[in-house]
Amino acid sequence: KQLLKEALAPEPAPKPAPEPAPEPAPEPAPEAAPEPAAAAPEAAPE
C-alpha cells in the first residue's frame, strides 16, 4: 500500500500545502488572545 501511495504522490503538491497552513495559523491566534486578556484585569481594579 505504501508503494502505491508514493508512486501516485511523487509530486511536490502535498508538501507546500500543509507547511504554510499550520505556521501562520497558530502564531496570530495566541498572540492576539493574551493582549485583550491583560487589559481586562487592569480596568477592573480601577
Curated annotation (Swiss-Prot):
Keyword Phosphoprotein: no
Location(s), subcellular: Secreted
Alphabetized UniProt keyword annotations: Repeat, Secreted
Residue spans of the PAPE repeats: 16-19, 20-23, 24-27, 28-31
Repeat found in the keyword field: yes
Signal sequence segment: none
Known tissue expression: Expressed by the venom gland.
Name assigned to this protein: Pape peptide
Organism the protein comes from: Tityus stigmurus (Brazilian scorpion)
